[in-house]
């Protein structure tokens, strides 16, 4: 149970998550990180089983590093998404219980966002929410999303979306993590102090 959000802005991609880690209805951790840097130009959020998440993320990070060494350039995001799709598809019947949002900026597609489900299905999205809080987050996204959002506007929208989930979903809570990925700055975390101002304790 969690909430993860991805948004494509005109100048980059925003990924946001809550910080609560649950095991059923038990709150296992209150400061979990659910956004992972794969390379300077791409990151992923995942919801699902922690052991499966760690395994899939290690494969993704390794593949990105291998590609950079072999080709002397960053891996195209679509290639990385195809890799995780095949990994999940061919793991059947012993599936990885993960639901992924992969987003970033590359030379081929610019700002781009993909969703990969636990069976390996890939969809390209302008905005997406996953996890138990996704119905509440999607409502906020659908009301306010525009294709001409700046990165700062997309950050504000992502925070509103996760905040809506935290208010209504018992599986989401404890604060918000936000990451931006742009061509100029690459992977960058939004500071915790900003999160505390937006979500007072």
From Swiss-Prot:
Description of activity control: The formation of the proteasomal ATPase PAN-20S proteasome complex, via the docking of the C-termini of PAN into the intersubunit pockets in the alpha-rings, triggers opening of the gate for substrate entry. Interconversion between the open-gate and close-gate conformations leads to a dynamic regulation of the 20S proteasome proteolysis activity.
Domain of life: Archaea
Record keywords, A-Z: Autocatalytic cleavage, Cytoplasm, Hydrolase, Protease, Proteasome, Threonine protease, Zymogen
Keyword match Heme: no
InterPro entries: Ntn_hydrolases_N (IPR029055), Pept_T1A_Psome_bsu_arc (IPR019983), Pept_T1A_subB (IPR000243), Proteasome_bsu_CS (IPR016050), Proteasome_sua/b (IPR001353), Proteasome_suB-type (IPR023333)
Catalysed reaction, written as an equation: Cleavage of peptide bonds with very broad specificity
GO molecular function terms noted in the UniProt entry: threonine-type endopeptidase activity
Main location: cytoplasm
GO BP, sorted A to Z: proteasomal protein catabolic process
Active site: 2
GO cellular component terms attached to this protein's record: cytoplasm; proteasome core complex, beta-subunit complex
Subcellular location: Cytoplasm
Pro-peptide positions on chain: 1
E.C. numbers: 3.4.25.1
Family to which this protein belongs: Belongs to the peptidase T1B family.
Assembly and binders: The 20S proteasome core is composed of 14 alpha and 14 beta subunits that assemble into four stacked heptameric rings, resulting in a barrel-shaped structure. The two inner rings, each composed of seven catalytic beta subunits, are sandwiched by two outer rings, each composed of seven alpha subunits. The catalytic chamber with the active sites is on the inside of the barrel. Has a gated structure, the ends of the cylinder being occluded by the N-termini of the alpha-subunits. Is capped at one or both ends by the proteasome regulatory ATPase, PAN.
UniProt xrefs under HAMAP family: Proteasome_B_A
Function: Component of the proteasome core, a large protease complex with broad specificity involved in protein degradation.
UniProt-recorded name of the protein: Proteasome subunit beta 1
